[in-house]
C-alpha cells in the first residue's frame, strides 16, 4: 500500500512516498511553479497525509493535486497527544509543523528535549521528560534575514547566500553573508546551551549548514513528516 506524506511549509512543499513503511521516493517543490505542473507520484497512492502552515492558495493547490486520492488526512494541532501536552493556552495557534515535530521527537526520545527546526524560520521548542511542552522561540531564518536586507536597504541590494567563514568580511557581500550566518549560528548555539542536559533534536534544510555533523545534536531528516504519520495512523481509516 502506497501512502503520500506532504509537509507544506512557508516557502516550499516537502513530500515523500511510503510503501509498507519504507520511503521509496521523495522530493521538494518550491512555491511559484504552476500547481498543475507540481510533480508528485499520486498515481497508485491510496492515502495521503498533509501538514500545512502555508496559504489557502497552496492548500487549494494541494487539494487539486490529491483529488484522485480517496483518503486524505489533514493534521491539526491539539491540546495534547498521549502524554505530550501543548504549552499554548490557545493550543491551535501553535504551528502544526512544530506540533508534529514535537510528537515525533518525543515518540522517538521520551526524555528532556530541545527541538530545533531550521527552515524559513528557525523554531525552538522545549519539552520535559514527562511530555510537558515548555514553550519555545521563533526567529527568522537566514533567507528571511538576507531578503530583509535586500528589500529594505537600497545600497545592499543583490543576491546573497550563506558564508560559514566567521572571520570579518572584507567586502559588503562577505560582511552580509557572514553576518547573517553568524547570527543564525549564535542563536542556535545559545538556545542549545540553555538545555545542555537535554537531548537536542534538529531538523530542517538549514541545520547542516549551521551545525555540520556535530555529534552533540541528534539530526532527524523528516521530523515533521514522521510526526504526521504517527498522528495520521492513529486515526481510523475511512
Curated annotation (Swiss-Prot):
Keywords: ATP-binding, Coenzyme A biosynthesis, Cytoplasm, Kinase, Metal-binding, Nucleotide-binding, Potassium, Transferase. One of its GO terms (molecular function) is metal ion binding. It is an enzyme of class 2 (transferase). Gene3D superfamilies: 3.30.420.40. The keyword Transferase applies. ATP binds at residues 7-14, 120. Pfam families: Pan_kinase. The keyword ATP-binding applies. Pathway: Cofactor biosynthesis; coenzyme A biosynthesis; CoA from (R)-pantothenate: step 1/5. K(+) binds at residue 117. One of its GO terms (biological process) is coenzyme A biosynthetic process. One of its GO terms (cellular component) is cytoplasm. SUPFAM superfamilies: Actin-like ATPase domain. Substrate binds at residues 88, 95-98, 172. Its EC number is 2.7.1.33. The active site is at residue 97. It comes from the Bacteria. It is found in: Cytoplasm. Its cofactor is NH4(+); K(+). A monovalent cation. Ammonium or potassium. It catalyses: (R)-pantothenate + ATP = (R)-4'-phosphopantothenate + ADP + H(+). Catalyzes the phosphorylation of pantothenate (Pan), the first step in CoA biosynthesis. Belongs to the type III pantothenate kinase family. Homodimer. This is Type III pantothenate kinase.
Amino acid at each position: 500500500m502506497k501512502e503520500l506524506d506532504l509537509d507544506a511549509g512557508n516557502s516550499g512543499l516537502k513530500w515523500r512516498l511510503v510503501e509498507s513503511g519504507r520511503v521509496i521516493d521523495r522530493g521538494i517543490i518550491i512555491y511559484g511553479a504552476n500547481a498543475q505542473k507540481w510533480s508528485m507520484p499520486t498515481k497508485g497512492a491510496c492515502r495521503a497525509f498533509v501538514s500545512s502552515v502555508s496559504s489557502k492558495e497552496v492548500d487549494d493547490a494541494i487539494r487539486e493535486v490529491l483529488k484522485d486520492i480517496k483518503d486524505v488526512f489533514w493534521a491539526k494541532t491539539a491540546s495534547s497527544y498521549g502524554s505530550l501536552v501543548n504549552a499554548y493556552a490557545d493550543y491551535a495557534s501553535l504551528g502544526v509543523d512544530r506540533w508534529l515535530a514535537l510528537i515525533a521527537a518525543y515518540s522517538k526520545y521520551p526524555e528532556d528535549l530541545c527541538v530545533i527546526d531550521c527552515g524559513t524560520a528557525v523554531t525552538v521548542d522545549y519539552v520535559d521528560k514527562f511530555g510537558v511542552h515548555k514553550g519555545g522561540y521563533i526567529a527568522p531564518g537566514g533567507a528571511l534575514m538576507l531578503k530583509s536586507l535586500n528589500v529594505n536597504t537600497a545600497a545592499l541590494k543583490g543576491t546573497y547566500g550563506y558564508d560559514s567563514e566567521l572571520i570579518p568580511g572584507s567586502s559588503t557581500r562577505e560582511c552580509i553573508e557572514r553576518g547573517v550566518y553568524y547570527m543564525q549560528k549564535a542563536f542556535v548555539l545559545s538556545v542549545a546551551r540553555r538545555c545542555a542536559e537535554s537531548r537536542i533534536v534538529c531538523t530542517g534544510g538549514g541545520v547542516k549548514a549551521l551545525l555540520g555533523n556535530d555529534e552533540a545534536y541528534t539530526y532527524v531528516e523528516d521530523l515533521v513528516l514522521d510526526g504526521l504519520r504517527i498522528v495520521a495512523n492513529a486515526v481510523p481509516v475511512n
